[in-house]
Amino acid sequence: WKGSRLLADGSFGTYYAEKFQTTELPETANTKYPERVKAIHEEYLAAGAQLIRTNTYASTQAAFENRDALKENILAGCEAAGQAAQQGMGKVYIAGSIGPEVMDQRTTQERIQEYADRGTWLQQGGVDLLVFETFSDVTEIIPAISVLKRQQNIPILVNLAVNQYGYTGAGLSAAKLLKELAQVEEIDGLGLNCGIGPGHMAALFHKLALPEDKIWAALPNAGYPYRLQSRMQFSDNRVYFAQKMGEIAGKGVEIIGGCCGTDPSYIKSLAEQRDIWKAERDLSVGKEKETVGNREEKKATPALHDFYRDAEGACKKKKLIAVELAPPMNADDEKIMEAAHYLQNHEVDVLTFPDSPSGRTRADAILMAEKVSKETEMCV
């Protein structure tokens, strides 16, 4: 797949809930309503998808009575996808979807074994590849991936879920996690999915130079949901979605698709977006940025860590200037970044970030400080 581009499907869960007006766990349909599962796969294939994911994202032990029921559910999900693929036009790839395990009383080793078991049953179900989706921490999946790769040498992808600042739900930097994962030989592909819309995901990919020895994937949400009559809804965002996915494709991303809020109409719009399929890798990306998998170590200057010292490490012989920047009240950080760069160029020594000034809801002060520090190299 490296060097080519594949169109993946969109969301199964949110589309299933909307299509059948139900709040039940979509994965239970694998055994209860297999014809529904097959029909949704067929809709995505008709829209132009070349890669479909099994309806097994939340097929975990916590959701089913016992291991036998879980195994039956996963194999049924594989069967539904396989039946749909047989009726597709051309080659169709089936990805076995694995979502995060529930954090409960089980030990770390037990959860690692659970990941390995789920992957094993997907392999037995005949999938072409495995995809670990929407992860915020990779500690437990790396050992499981090693086990699965030894069992069957099929491609394994890992997709992280991040916020608009590039951090996962566990408060970890996606750039650092991707760097760690890029060093794992058993992992064939990396990417981002869920959590954010196409605009923020495109902005994150603009800041990354992607190692060429890995497959890269991008599957953002349709946008950001709103609540209507006790249901989470997504606005129709297809035109903007396709436009931003065209930008992402130009960064060298091979697998393009969607997550929450997307449906077959979104995938059809991607299939018809010529910019996506004729996009060539933007070789200028990352020339002045750090490469995820091959980051050049930088020597930390004393001024970065000790704002009261000069470049030689001696205490500055001047009055120090500290400026407070309040985090934005929404996701738009353009003004605060402009202010930070302005202050950087006017001999300000350190920036401070208050936590919820005036008691108003704002962007997280720690994450905002981290972002400013990374982009300006100022002490915060």
Question: What positions do the PLM features span?
Answer:
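Domain-level signal for soluble alpha/beta catalytic cores
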Residues: 1-380
